Amino acid sequence: MAIQKLWKKGLIGALAISMLAACSDGSSSSNEVKSDLSLEEITKKAKEEGTVNSVGMPDTWANWVETWEELGTEYSLKHKDTDMSSAEELAKFEAEKDDATADIGDVGIAFGPIAKDKDLTLPYKTSYWDEIPDWAKDDEGHWIVGYTGTISFLTDKNNVKNAPKSWEDIKNGDYTVSIGDALTANQAQFAILAAAMAFGGDESNIQPGIDFFADLAKQGRLKGDPTVANLEKGEIDVAILWDFNSLGYRHQIDEKRFDVVIPSEGSVTSGYATIINKYAKNPHTAMLAREYILSDAGQENLAKGYARPIRDKVQLSQDVQKLLLPEEMYKNAQPVKDQKKWEETTKQIPQLYQEQVLIHGK
């Protein structure tokens, strides 16, 4: 899969979120679709529609390709995707309205509530509703997380003799660390939040995380951009990344050369959610696609792309389980409890990081 592309989907700063949230016009759709149909009825109507058009769900992202292929084989659905960011997906839904060319999209969890508030989504809970954690779904089914990411450490063992297992290990180490551009990158901002959580903070108190990275900067240990190219060249000692990126990068470069762990004191988990376009021309194929994404087969497809399934009860094959980190590594990882507070905090991070961390750059 295109791993580099995977983390770039998260390069959405608070500016894009706040701009979208401020632009709702409250208009409604003339395209009324029943979302309480049985799965049998949805399947019948989906086969009649025959096509599902997605946005932000390309073949190369999280192994979507197998899900689209299987929907084609099992239900004779044709598929087309237009790749774009979460913000662009919502803008497209809103701009096109009744002239919709997209039926379903995949967005960062922060964009789910915005899409609902802007009246752009069609609710559908699926057969797996009770297995989805409360934090990972809208109460009415307007958005549902399909897979998660948790902040992890990716260590180049050629450069670091004892790979860090905890934030405390990094604090006491002498190697360089990379999180990327925290002024704009969603992944880097979550890395700061994860560090904050480990040292007593939370989504409304990011200061412990800022202090952690400021100390690294003062020591000249905060370096570089954690790209595949830089990692391959050996320019990064420890990268702090989503677990799916760490695992994907390791697979892409050299399985034996890199160590991947979830920090033992704690980390933060976030996710990506499907949204069904309220104005969709093929609403039932979109519902069926969401249903399939949350099925055992759909969840396994995502896991093959190193994305961790949202359903804990899903039965993955042994070969696919081996692609992911052990479940016990996640025992101290937790999701953002208050998305609105986190949204406000992300607006403050660029200035805090610039004034308290980057100022010490060496």
Identify the role of each PLM range.
Residues S152-N159, I192-A198, S270-N282, I293, ...:
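A bilobed periplasmic-binding-protein/Venus flytrap-type ligand-binding module shared by bacterial periplasmic
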Residues S24-G26:
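Bacterial signal peptide processing site
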Residues K331-K362:
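Conserved C-terminal helix/tail region of periplasmic/extracytoplasmic solute-binding proteins
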Residues T176-T184, Y292-L316:
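Periplasmic-binding protein-like
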Residues N53-W68, K80-E94, D98-I236:
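Extracytoplasmic ligand-binding site segments that recognize negatively charged/polar headgroups
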Residues A110-K116, E232, V238-R257:
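A ligand-binding cleft/hinge motif common to bilobed small-molecule-binding domains
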Residues L39-V52, M57-K78, Y249:
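Short, polar/charged alpha-helical segment
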Residues M19-A22:
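C-terminal motif of bacterial Sec signal peptides marking the signal peptidase cleavage site
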